[in-house]
């Protein structure tokens, strides 16, 4: 049995009711279909609001990153602490006591091992960090989540920011995840300005997140060779394909997806077909898709928000998959690691690649 790869702990004061809703949002996200392709036990989500003692004012049980687990149980490779910053918790930390010691221990654990322990503040009430003991302890740590609390947009941003932060903490991603925006400027007879409007909307939404962007028209510098620049960027970034009517028929669009898949990079498709495709392409198979819809002639912003969330989920899945592979290499398993570790990427584009490692299990 492999030790857990990622454990997410949602910590909040029982008096801050929004903490329950944040916890439920994260439980649904990390236990849902988005992460169902990982080997069992890769992700666990725990909620820590209640006192660990009979004292109702007491703090929750210590986390494994603070106090070692009994019986030699191994800690997870990555620990993400989601601290819901509400007014009740801020008030409790004003005076010395078990909750202040508990939150201080979380901050100390992050400071001692920031490559494996992350602290992600979710500020659900304004001014909780302003000239408070709470702010002194954790206010210097960049939080997650944007927008009005309890809205769908806020919940989506919390999930996306958390997944991005964990992926970057896993050291399998650059300091900032970069989105390679793949699209075609060739339009069908009925698309007109709709495609450019959608691409602009996607770019605006990326700009409103903590994600970086590679967009060929702006990223490739004058006097640079654009072909190798695009190949290199597609092999290093998380690829978001805006699939319009002519997308699958464009050679360079297929090439960009092919480069990303061969490099093992995440790929997600935003389906924005108006009439449909006259031809398809096998290189676009086996990747998550999100439909883009028009309402009164305007692209729905929520569809773009959803596809960016799915793309970041794929980035985190890639990090966790590789962590599992690294850990499994050092333990005795009843199956050959070469078999299950490569199932994630068994596709024709990889088989045709001369660098693709051959599996020892026959198919």
Kindly give the residue locations of the regions a language model identified.
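Glycine-rich, charge-decorated loop segments at or immediately adjacent to ligand/cofactor-binding or catalytic sites
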Residues: 126-141, 226, 275-291
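Generic beta-sheet signal
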Residues: 122-125, 242, 270-272
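Charged, amphipathic alpha-helical linkers/stalks
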Residues: 277, 282-284, 290-328
């Amino acid at each position: 049995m492999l030790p857990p790869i990622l454990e997410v702990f949602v910590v909040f004061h029982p008096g801050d009711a929004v903490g329950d809703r944040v916890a439920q949002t994260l439980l649904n996200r990390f236990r849902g279909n988005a992460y169902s392709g990982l080997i069992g036990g890769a992700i666990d989500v725990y909620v820590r609001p209640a006192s660990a003692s009979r004292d109702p004012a007491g703090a929750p049980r210590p986390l494994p990153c603070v106090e070692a687990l009994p019986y030699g149980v191994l800690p997870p490779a990555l620990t993400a602490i989601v601290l819901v910053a509400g007014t009740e918790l801020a008030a409790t930390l004003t005076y010395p006591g078990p909750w202040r010691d508990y939150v201080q221990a979380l901050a100390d654990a992050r400071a001692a091992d920031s490559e494996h322990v992350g602290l992600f503040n979710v500020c659900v009430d304004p001014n909780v960090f302003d000239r408070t003991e709470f702010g002194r302890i954790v206010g210097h740590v960049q939080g997650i989540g944007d927008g009005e609390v309890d809205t769908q947009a806020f919940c989506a941003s919390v999930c996306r920011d958390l997944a991005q932060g964990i992926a970057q903490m896993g050291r399998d991603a650059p300091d900032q995840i970069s989105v390679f925006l793949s699209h075609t400027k060739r339009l069908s007879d009925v698309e007109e300005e709709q495609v450019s409007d959608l691409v602009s909307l996607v770019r605006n939404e990326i700009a409103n997140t903590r994600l970086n962007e590679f967009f060929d028209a702006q990223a490739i510098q004058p006097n640079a060779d654009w072909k190798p620049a695009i190949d290199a960027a597609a092999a290093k970034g998380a690829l978001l394909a805006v699939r319009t009517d002519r997308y699958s028929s464009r050679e360079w669009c297929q090439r960009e997806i092919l480069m990303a898949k061969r490099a093992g990079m995440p790929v997600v498709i935003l389906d924005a077909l108006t009439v449909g495709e006259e031809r398809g392409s096998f290189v676009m198979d086996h990747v998550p898709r999100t439909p883009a819809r028009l309402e009164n002639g305007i692209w729905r912003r929520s569809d773009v928000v959803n596809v960016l969330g799915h793309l970041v989920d794929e980035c985190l899945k890639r990090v966790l998959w590789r962590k599992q592979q690294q850990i499994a290499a050092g333990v005795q398993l009843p199956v050959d690691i070469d078999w299950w570790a490569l199932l994630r990427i068994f596709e024709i584009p990889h088989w045709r690649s001369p660098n693709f490692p051959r599996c020892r299990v026959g198919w």
